[in-house]
Amino acid sequence: MPNTTSDNYTFGKTFTIADIVEEAFERVGFPNVTGYQLKAARRSLNILFQEWGNRGLHYWEVGTLNLTLTQGEREFNFYRYPSDMPTTGAAALQKSNGLNTTLDGAISSTGATSGITMDSITGMNNQGTIRIGTEDITYVGFSGSELTGVTRGAHDTTAATHSDGATVTNYVPGFSDIEQCSLRTNMGGNTQSDAALGKVDRSTYSGYANKESEGTPSNYWVQRFIDRVTMTIYPTPDASNAAKNLHIFFVKRIQDAGTYSNATDVPYRFIPCMVSGLAYYLSQKFRMEKTQPFKLLYEDELARALQEDGSAASTYITPKAYYPNI
């Protein structure tokens, strides 16, 4: 009797968009699909991912980011995509999307993927994207202060040369919302400390009499637009807070499907409901009689995945004393 297992855990990594579409269409009753049906399925998959944005917090899309505070600067913009960033006007002067540092040495070649070194990597994400000028560069790690696993001209930007000391912003595409924010003192040192900021709504922020008043930030207000998320802090940082940072827990959007050879930006636990959801969407186009049972299956599998997703915490039960007639 065979007792050998695969010792492999990469199904989700190798389960391509083409495979997902094929599986969904087989459930609908189409073992062979046309080019138009492939295109329609990929479009439906992207719509499904957008709909998941209304299904609560997806913990695999939660990340952290650090911002460098500047005296007198209270508004920060987090853009959906590099092409959404303004290049002129007042908005272009606002801090956009991340921690600032500088290049330690010029990048003299548009094809260089090594020797890209930062003056400081304190507070930078362990992997992510930096923006220098109008170019995005992705990386997967550090060797000292040098970026490793570099890809130039990412996110449809163009590789360029950059001078020593050029401003570098640790950039995160696909921003959706800010969950938590803290004022961080002495970042990277053994005396580092965080003080949580309170998240306020529009009416509360509107009630602040002097929004230009400077001091130690204690609250923040988030606005969610089509192309960006804007965070405004209060009070405006003063000189004593200019060397401090904001440490942010943010939520990103789920990445688009892209080409048919791509994998999806979805953990393995959500693969069953993703395929069921796509089959449900496709049934509305090609097999209306199957729409209702597919919807029930999809909602059931999605509910289980959402219940499993997240971060569990300890539960404490405290007895409550009750004294009647006192």
Predicted features and spans:
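Glycine-enriched, solvent-exposed interface loops adjoining structured elements
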Residues: 1-99, 129-131, 163-326
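Small/polar beta-strand repeat architecture
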Residues: 96-109, 113-114, 119-126, 131-174, ...
